[in-house]
Amino acid sequence: MPVFKAPFNGYSVKFSPFYESRLAVATAQNFGILGNGRIHVLELAPGAPGVTESVSYDTADAVYDVCWSESHDSVLIAAIGDGSVKIYDTALPPPSNPIRSFQEHAREVQSVDYNPTRRDSFLTSSWDDTVKLWAMDRPASVRTFKEHAYCVYQAVWNPKHGDVFASASGDCTLRIWDVREPGSTMIIPAHDFEILSCDWNKYDDCILATSSVDKTVKVWDVRSYRVPLAVLNGHGYAVRKVKFSPHRRSLIASCSYDMSVCLWDYMVEDALVGRYDHHTEFAVGIDMSVLVEGLMASTGWDELVYVWQQGMDPRAS
């Protein structure tokens, strides 16, 4: 399976929604504590195990997350450790990038998510305890959402409702928001420890998953959220990212500081259906391809990016 070695520690990996062979990777020097960052755009070789870098962009601070535009196939957005949000166009020569840079967050930007239904806006979340809404044609953020009492590690759009998003915070709450409303519409005390990630089910717009420092992944139904639908135990340390499959309703991927990537089917009794122990440092980034069913990617502090098919060994050549 394809493996890419980056010079810095991996933080995030995202498949392109337009090209099945293209990925973007966010990396940071010195584990994101101090130093530069780099964004890599990778291409999978058709019918071969190789992966090549088509372009890279250096940043003066760590890159914690990256996402692709849902409306322009060459555009990606990066969340930077200096509080900035930068937009890149891979169709332009590297010296022309970034094409835009926004400096509004007061602390590190932890996540960025492009609206999959409206296709003209995106969210960022930050260690400054806020979530910001941005429009591609605006010179500044459209709105700032300030309710969380601690770092907002991730904010993600609902896949079916273009005005609804969820945010996961170190204040131990999961919040549901509608951008048409003045405040959050729902507050779920989802874990007793910091919540590091959240994601919506791609087939049921009322179901979402959270992951936490408490080593669990939990599945929630916003129509009845006093008790989780499922609690998934199996990781040995904090669960850094959680991601619902775009192809199978009940399939969830997660990655952890225990260096593993796990696959779960939350609707069956023995929920842990796959475990991959290919990373040798914290596994912190995971994605599943929308265009190729079963294709997964992960990255971690071991500076490696793996791309593999579910059920295969990520390290197999």
UniProtKB/Swiss-Prot annotation:
Any single biological process term in GO: protein import into peroxisome matrix
Gene Ontology annotations for the cellular component aspect, listed alphabetically: Cul4-RING E3 ubiquitin ligase complex; cytosol; peroxisomal matrix
Highest taxon listed in the record's lineage: Eukaryota
Gene Ontology MF terms in the entry: peroxisome matrix targeting signal-2 binding
Compartments it resides in: Cytoplasm, Cytosol; Peroxisome matrix
PANTHER family named among the record's database cross-references: PEROXISOMAL TARGETING SIGNAL 2 RECEPTOR (PTHR46027:SF1)
Family in the record: Belongs to the WD repeat peroxin-7 family.
Domain notes: The WD40 repeats are involved in the binding of PTS2-containing proteins.
Record protein name field: Peroxisome biogenesis protein 7
Organism encoding this protein: Arabidopsis thaliana (Mouse-ear cress)
